[in-house]
Each structure stands twice: as structure tokens, then as C-alpha cells.
């Protein structure tokens, strides 16, 4: 979390480089059918557009210098967030999973192999809702780069082939309602279109 400075600021945090904050979604949170069912437990669900990294091989204590050798490819994803429940968890000093790791909370587009596109380090990251631009950033604004994220994470957990890492979202997060159409794009990787149902 908080891997783009402007998003850190809009969420009330200091954007200076600090160890990244990670949370885990469940494997069944990932959906690819282009639909996001609005969760009944929340009244304030936000979009967060992100580049996702898919691992081809796992490991632990992976050096930064060899981290990219573990990457299969990249995709476009949405980290849908029950902002109201996340806020309550933060105030209580509890983990964020109640706001982040719920059913269908991680819509993802197709994965593109790194063997085809390399390892993107720059390129536009955008999200439109009903045709209106909401989020705009660039991969070159990532505070923690992909090799650093993989290395750091692998020091905390043993990573597995098939693991998906969401890399953070640029500024402009906001609420969606049923009927909204979200169009996410990461330059050089692809796009995703998701309807809130």
C-alpha cells in the first residue's frame, strides 16, 4: 500500500520512502469476468487501479538483483476497497483485510508474459469511471519498484508460483455505485473493463 506519493498524501500519510505495507487477499478474490458485485456490508466502496505482477517461480529471501527472474508477467487489476470498513479497522488498530480481502475484490485482466513485453518501469496508469478520468499516474512514480517489492515480500513470506502482487495505486481513488463502468489501463500491458453490479 501507499506506493505512489500523491495517493499516500490523499490518504493522510507521509509519502517519504518507508518499508511498504502489505496485506493479503484470498485467491478467490480474483475475478476475471468483468463484473464486480457491490458488497452488501459496505456503503463506501472505492476503486484503486494497479499494475499486477504474476510470479512464475517462488522462493524466500530473494535478492533484489535476481527478483525479476521470478516474474511470469504483468496485468491490469483493481484493488476494490470497502473504505468505510477499512477506516474502522485502521482506527481500531486492526488489520485491513475486512476492507480489502472480500469476495470479488480483485478484478484482473489478462496476464501478458514478460517474455513479450519485458519489465515495464514507465507508462501511464489510468482509470475512468463512466468515461470520466478519475486516476492518472505513471509506473515511474512507484516508490518501491517491482524487484524491491518481490525481495521485501519474500523476506516475510515464502512466495509461490502463481502469486499475484498488486503494486499500488495512483491518486484519485473514489467511490463507485451499482451501474458504474470502470475502465483501467496500464500502458504497455493492457486494459480492463469492469461493471459494478
Ranges and model annotations:
Residues 2-71:
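Extended, compositionally biased flexible segments
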Residues 3, 7-17, 75, 83-197:
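Catalytic-pocket segment enriched in acidic/His residues
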Amino acid at each position: 500500500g501507499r506506493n505512489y506519493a500523491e495517493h499516500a498524501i490523499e490518504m493522510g500519510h507521509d509519502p517519504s520512502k518507508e518499508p511498504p505495507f502489505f496485506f493479503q487477499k484470498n485467491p478467490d478474490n480474483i475475478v476475471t469476468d468483468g463484473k464486480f458485485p457491490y458488497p452488501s456490508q459496505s456503503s463506501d466502496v472505492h476503486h484503486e487501479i494497479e499494475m499486477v505482477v504474476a510470479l512464475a517461480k517462488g522462493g524466500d529471501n530473494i535478492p533484489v538483483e535476481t527478483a525479476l527472474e521470478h516474474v511470469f508477467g504483468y496485468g491490469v487489476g483493481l484493488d476494490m476497497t470497502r473504505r468505510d470498513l477499512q477506516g474502522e479497522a485502521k482506527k481500531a488498530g486492526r488489520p485491513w483485510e475486512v476492507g480489502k480481502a472480500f469476495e470479488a475484490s480483485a478484478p484482473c485482466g489478462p496476464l501478458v508474459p514478460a517474455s513479450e513485453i519485458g519489465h515495464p518501469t514507465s507508462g501511464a496508469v489510468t482509470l475512468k469511471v463512466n468515461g470520466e478520468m478519475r486516476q492518472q499516474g505513471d509506473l515511474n512514480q512507484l516508490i518501491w519498484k517491482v524487484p524491491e517489492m518481490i525481495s521485501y515480500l519474500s523476506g516475510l513470506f515464502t512466495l509461490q508460483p502463481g502469486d499475484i502482487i498488486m503494486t499500488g495505486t495512483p491518486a484519485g481513488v473514489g467511490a463507485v455505485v451499482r451501474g458504474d463502468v470502470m475502465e483501467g489501463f496500464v500502458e504497455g500491458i493492457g486494459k480492463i473493463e469492469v461493471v459494478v453490479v
